[in-house]
Curated annotation (Swiss-Prot):
The keyword Transmembrane helix applies. It comes from the Bacteria. One of its GO terms (cellular component) is plasma membrane. Belongs to the methyl-accepting chemotaxis (MCP) protein family. It is a multi-pass membrane protein. It is found in: Cell membrane. Chemotactic-signal transducers respond to changes in the concentration of attractants and repellents in the environment, transduce a signal from the outside to the inside of the cell, and facilitate sensory adaptation through the variation of the level of methylation. SMART domains: HAMP, MA. It comes from Thermotoga maritima (strain ATCC 43589 / DSM 3109 / JCM 10099 / NBRC 100826 / MSB8). This is Methyl-accepting chemotaxis protein 1. Residues 299-351 form the HAMP domain. One of its GO terms (biological process) is chemotaxis. The keyword Cell membrane applies. The lineage of its organism: Bacteria, Thermotogati, Thermotogota, Thermotogae, Thermotogales.
Length: 656
């Protein structure tokens, strides 16, 4: 084990001893606190039970005194209860109500301290039966939503029970008894007290929603209640909802009630931890001093040895720059001096080897690089020569083809020139025809516009004709109406003439003529109406047909505009084609002259290229010989480079 580990082991032993001391102190203090709390809580429960006894005794004494006094007066129940009202009113925090019930007259009354009410005697017979054979009776119940403990005492007159007197002890959160039990019964900050009947029913709890519940339903009190019923251990520890709790019980002397005082152990132990904090701080300071003394005395030696071990490790890995310093007169200093001498001797030897290896490596690298470059250049030159030779051969073949092609181009250029001239003449004819077509389309457009105007006017005439037919129809209806009225008048006139006898005969002839004229007018109007009906039908057909014609004219007008637009575009494109044909003709004439000159020049170039090809064939054979020699030199240089790299690898392990 190294010295450093031994030092740390010693420190760990010291710290472990301190921790063990802390634990023993904590256990001792915790046990002392628990014993002290147990004793204090038992005394607290006894004191609380005495308080409950005094409270219950006071209530029972008041009830008995009232029963004794009232039993000798032969009062009616209402009058008895009216006297109890003052007692309830003065002690609201103790009493919730009072009542009396008399058996001989079946009367009963109740007071809450504010008023007295007559009540049904039958509702209180249960109390009379419950107190039979007893001098006092307690009944837990709820009065107007308030939990109470009802105390019932019999009224005796001349050794005969004539009724009962009862008081309801207030058990709500506002009552003195609740505050005393819950607040004074807490064994810790979050604890509380309980008042429970002998059959396990809860009378007082910090949450009065648990009133009259079985104490076993609350959780955690089962063991304490069993000990109370059996008269066993008064201090009970248990775990509830993951927390350690304790409960102390005490029986209320003279009554079948139990007081339970409960609290949380953790809250009490927290107080104990505060008490032991000073002792723990003292131990911590003492341990810190010991730790500091060990650290100051041992760490310099450990640090020096670690430094030397690190230097030896680096020296063994080849780092010759390590310097061993010999300071002091101890054994560690002698080791440092021996290491220093060995390092100097080895360093001189390695430096010489490194320098020789560097020179050899540099020379071999230069030879290798030069030979590789020479070999690569030879290979590249050979490849380039092949490419040039291939290109020259290709060029010679291409020049031959180009020469024949140029001659063909010259002949074709002349043909193209003639063709373009013919094409120019024909395109001009097409242009002329397109212009004439455009003019005719525009003329057709004018005619279509006139037709459209005529159609619009015809549409207006038809509308006027329809309106006139409607007017005539209205006039005919008027005439028909007049004819009917005239016929009616003629009929009336004939009737009057008949009444007048001979004097009215001339008038009857006139009336008959008027009637005939009216009938003819009626027939004429009917004929006119039939003709108008036929005319209207014809007009409707004409109007429907004219609508279709108008729509067709509109479509023709739109299509005429579109055709005119397309003709104009065609004319523009034809003019562009004419311009391109003229340019092509001029270019063809120029290319014909140039092609003849190119054919002559290409013959001369072909001859020169053939001479170059012969020279390249001779140069290729020379380059192949040079490439073979360069490859041999490169192989020898590569072998020398490998040997120098091996030597460099060996000496690189050392750092000087």
């Amino acid at each position: 084990m190294s010295l450093r580990k031994k030092v740390f082991l010693l420190m760990i032993v010291v710290v472990a001893g301190l921790l063990l001391s802390f634990f023993l102190i904590y256990r001792s203090v915790s046990n002392s606190i628990i014993n002290s709390v147990r004793s204090n809580t038992e005394n607290q429960a006894k004191a609380l039970s005495k308080f409950v006894v005094e409270k219950l005794n006071n209530v029972t004494n008041v009830a008995r005194s009232a029963a004794t006094y009232l039993g000798s007066q032969f009062f009616e129940a209402y009058m008895i209860t009216n006297q109890l009202k003052t007692t309830v009113e003065k002690e609201k925090s103790t009493f919730a109500f009072a009542f009396s019930a008399l058996s001989f007259n079946k009367s009963a009354a109740l007071t809450d301290g504010n008023r007295v009410d007559r009540v049904d005697f039958a509702d209180y017979e249960k109390y009379i039966k419950a107190v039979e054979g007893k001098d006092i009776f307690f009944m837990p119940e709820t009065f107007q939503g308030t939990p109470v403990l009802t105390v019932v005492v019999p009224i005796e007159t001349m050794n005969t029970r004539t009724g009962i007197v009862g008081f309801g002890i207030n058990l709500s959160e506002n009552s003195d008894l609740w505050k005393a039990v819950v607040e004074e019964g807490k064994a810790s900050k979050s604890g509380y007290g309980l008042l429970v009947t002998s059959d396990g029913k809860v009378l007082i709890h910090k949450d009065m929603g648990n009133f009259m519940k079985d104490v076993k339903e609350l959780g955690g009190f089962e063991k304490a209640f069993e000990e109370a019923k059996s008269g066993g251990e008064k201090y009970v520890e248990y775990e509830y909802n993951g927390e350690k709790k304790y409960t102390v019980w005490e029986k209320v002397p003279g009554y079948d009630f139990y007081i339970f005082s409960t609290g949380y152990l953790e809250e009490l132990l927290a107080e104990g931890r505060k008490a032991t904090l000073g002792t723990i701080v003292t131990y911590v300071v003492f341990g810190g001093v010991i730790f500091a003394v060990l650290f100051v005395s041992m760490m310099p030696v450990v640090k020096r040895m670690r430094q030397q071990v690190e230097k030896v490790k680096r020296f063994g890995e080849g780092d010759l720059t390590v310097e061993f310093e010999a300071k002091g007169r101890d054994e560690l200093t002698q080791i440092e001096e021996s290491l220093k001498e060995a390092a100097l001797s080895l360093k001189e030897m390695i430096v010489s080897i490194i320098e020789a290896a560097k020179e050899l490596s540099g020379a071999s690298e230069e030879i290798k690089v030069l030979s590789e470059e020479s070999h690569k250049m030879s290979e590249n030159l050979h490849e380039e020569a092949k490419k040039i030779l291939d290109e020259a051969n290709n060029m010679s073949s291409a020049l031959t083809e180009v020469t024949s092609g140029v001659e063909e181009v010259a002949a074709s250029a002349q043909n193209i020139s003639k063709i373009t001239q013919d094409l120019t003449e024909r395109s001009e004819a097409v242009t002329k025809a397109a212009r004439e077509g455009t003019e005719r389309v525009e003329a057709v457009g004018g005619v279509i516009n006139k037709l459209k105007g005529s159609a619009e006017r015809q549409r207006d005439y038809l509308r006027e004709l329809v309106d006139s037919a409607k007017t005539i129809g209205e006039i005919v209806d008027t005439i028909s109406s007049i004819a009917e009225q005239t016929n009616l008048l003629a009929l009336n006139a004939a009737i009057e003439a008949a009444r007048a006898g001979e004097a009215g005969r001339g008038f009857a002839v006139v009336a008959d003529e008027i009637r005939k004229l009216a009938e003819e007018s009626q027939r004429a109007t009917e004929d006119i109406a039939k003709m108008l009906s036929s005319l209207r039908t014809t007009i409707e057909h004409v109007e429907n047909g004219s609508k279709e014609m108008f729509e067709g004219v509109d479509e023709i007008a739109v299509m005429g505009e579109e055709v005119t637009k397309r003709f104009r575009e065609i004319l523009g494109r034809i003019e562009e084609i004419n311009s391109m044909i003229e340019n092509t003709a001029a270019t063809a004439q120029e290319q014909g002259a140039a092609a003849e000159e190119m054919a002559s020049a290409m013959d001369n170039v072909t001859k020169i290229v053939e001479g170059v090809v012969e020279s390249l064939n001779r140069m290729e054979s020379l380059i192949e010989d040079q490439t073979t020699s360069a490859a041999k030199v490169s192989q020898a240089a590569e072998r020398l480079s490998e040997l120098s790299e091996q030597l460099s690898t060996l000496v690189q392990k050392f750092k000087v």
